[in-house]
Design a protein with these regions (language model features):
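Primarily short, surface-exposed interaction patches in extracytoplasmic proteins
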Residues: 1-10, 26-36, 40-44, 90, ...
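N-terminal cofactor/phosphate-binding cores enriched in small/glycine residues
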Residues: 19
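Active-site-surrounding "flap" and adjacent substrate/cofactor-binding loops of secreted or lumenal enzymes
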Residues: 12-13, 26-96
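Extreme N-terminus nucleophile/cap motif
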Residues: 16
Length: 166
């Protein structure tokens, strides 16, 4: 087992290292804020992220789209040319939303108030190996990442069960 870091070794460089390991690094002011705490407080501030308010707004489209079902129903009775056009429009919309989702998530990772939570979301996202190419719907990708955010630190069985339902 690792020995706890002695108080005299806790400094700015160690705080930067901790922030790199538990998150995605941070600006000098954030590193200094951690360095000003003692080691245990710094670790606790990253681990107890549920206590930190998260003001990040969700993307505008991050909710069920009631018009999507209607668009698919309309396509059922459409001519082959109209179906192709509707399909292209839907694919274009989903590609745009997927780009927005990626930007939104990268922003959360880079500047969000809960770096460990986002690092865990990225870990679980990679572990369960879902991709935009398979899902093709930004809302469902966002929803899965929200599941990982909510359950990032719960027990494995619960996460596995919920991810299986998702």
């Amino acid at each position: 087992m690792l020995k706890p870091l002695s108080a005299d070794k806790w400094n700015y460089a160690m705080a930067a290292h901790l922030l790199n390991r538990a998150g995605f690094g941070g600006p000098p002011a954030e590193i200094q804020k951690l360095a000003d705490l003692d080691h245990d407080q710094a670790v606790a501030s990253l681990l107890d992220y549920e206590k930190i308010p998260d003001p990040t707004a969700n993307p505008d489209w991050a909710r069920p789209d009631p018009t999507r079902i209607e668009r698919f129903r309309a396509a059922k009775d459409a001519s082959p040319e109209e179906k192709r056009k509707l399909q292209q429009d839907e694919q274009r919309l989903q590609r745009q939303r997927m780009l927005e989702l990626r930007g939104w998530w990268l922003q959360r990772m880079a500047t969000g108030p809960r770096p460990l939570q986002e690092k865990l979301v990225l870990f679980w996202h990679g572990h369960f190996a879902t991709s935009a190419d398979k899902v093709r719907d930004a809302y469902y990708m966002w929803r899965q990442n929200e599941l990982f955010r909510r359950l990032a630190t719960v027990n494995w069985q619960m996460l596995l069960l919920e991810a299986g339902k998702d």
